[in-house]
Amino acid sequence: MGDRVTERVLSDDASPWFMEHAARYRLAAGYVAGRSVLDVACGTGFGAARLMDAGATRVIGLDIAWDALTTASRLGLRDVGLCRADALSLPVADESVDVVTSFETIEHLRDGQAFIAEVRRVVNQTHGIVILSTPNAYATQPVDNVPKNPYHVREYYPEELTSLLAEHFPSVELKGQVVSRDYGYCPYWVTPASPASTVRQRLSGIGWKLERRLLPDSWKDSVSRLIHRRAFYPSDTDFVFDSSAVEVGHVTVAICKMQG
């Protein structure tokens, strides 16, 4: 297929991207109580377990990578089913799940249209909900539509994502993922090309990267609280999802419903 699927978010809260990823599952948790869930590209399964804890009746996690599923099985995830599967050929019956989640997946696939059609096939056609996320091309700024991330095949501008999803779902709502005003900004998202960054933020981002490289892990939080007055890494609750931040959010989240 020419897809690039080896990029992985591990279940390691020392990673700067872990809590950002976990925040999406926190958002999805508000939609799963009393419902069956399919988590496509579940990785190590930490998010699938969180959805189960949020009251889902059943959660199945699918991923193409054996190493991720092996890690997931070692974690002993309670009541979460795991299966190796291709996102373009889901081993699930038509209309068999209430909610589909799939975070940071579509940018790895050459045929995004086929992926969305497959997701729509398996979700309940009357009350189904699909929650997806993908990097915002306004933030990542691919050159001539070629992503800078070597694992990404295509990155979507919000209007492109809306157009694609609207072909399959009567209701599509986009939200930009940003850090809360209380936290300030997320330094590892600040790059010289970032449209939302100021000179001060860029300089702080450079300083943060130096601190990350040079400071022992045991010092990072203390030094960050002293200098920046916040934890070194944002927690999942430091991220918010705002419909007014679609163009500036580093990540776009789409909430698609079969009922308008």
Predicted features along the sequence, with ranges:
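Conserved N-terminal segment of class I S-adenosyl-L-methionine
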Residues: 1-93, 99, 103, 113-116, ...
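Feature marks short, surface-exposed loop/turn motifs that line or immediately flank catalytic pockets
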Residues: 68, 138-140, 181-182
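A short His-aromatic
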Residues: 104-108
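A short glycine-rich, Lys/Arg-flanked "PGG" loop and its adjoining helix->strand segment in the class I
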Residues: 113-128
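Short, glycine-/aromatic-enriched active-site segment of Class I SAM-dependent methyltransferases
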Residues: 132-154, 158
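Substrate-binding/catalytic lobe of Class I Rossmann-like enzymes that use SAM or dcSAM, i.e.
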Residues: 167-199
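Flexible, glycine-/basic-rich loop-and-beta segments that form/coincide
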Residues: 190-222
